Amino acid sequence: MLVNVDATLPKRGLTLIVGRSGAGKSTLLTLIAGLSEPTSGTLEVGEEAETTRTTPAAERARRTGIVFQFPERHFLGRTVMQELTFGWPTSANAFASRRELAYRMNDALHAVGMERVALDTEVRTLSGGYKRRLALAIQLVRNPRVLCLDEPLAGLDWQTRAELTALLDELKRDRAVVVVSHDVEEIQPITDRAFRMTTHGALADVSDELAGARARAYGEASDAFPSFD
């Protein structure tokens, strides 16, 4: 249960949400993404963020992409192409829409570093890191204003984690990226705003605390190198 959640997220940049397991972090992501409805209060996504009405779930879903923890468990297609084009319109008069989606797909594959992966590649043969990239590309094709990610680094080796962190740093430049993660040390350097969720589901802004920790870490790292003055 989420209680007294009060936060405004920037249109661009990466917002990190931390907290103990079971606090409701993943529930918050599903609310933002339009997969569930709040029982009270308001939740606005988009231009009407100054109004007092909740953005309808269908509209939130249209404006928001979400990548679940271990997204590979939710893949439905056999090949990369089937995954990327799942749900595209198939009617005879949908040519213009499909062409636009194809352009977006090309851009998305480049954005996540999969432009060299053949579209007929079977998804099951991809590495864990490339499966995460594919999950991101699927959402980017939809061109969401908000991109939510639940534990994006979970279960990956250190090199893949570093590559995905760098990718998120790029993606946040054009949209709001909301990340739920226990991997604070790795996400912290690219975080613009941070919240801690309590066991009661309330959010506390810890952006200044995070910035202070980052500054101290930078100072300690600098002290580790000899001075050449």
Language-model segments: residues:
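Helix-to-loop junction immediately C-terminal to a conserved catalytic motif
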Residues: 33
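Catalytic Walker B motif of ABC-type/P-loop ATPase nucleotide-binding domains
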Residues: 147-151
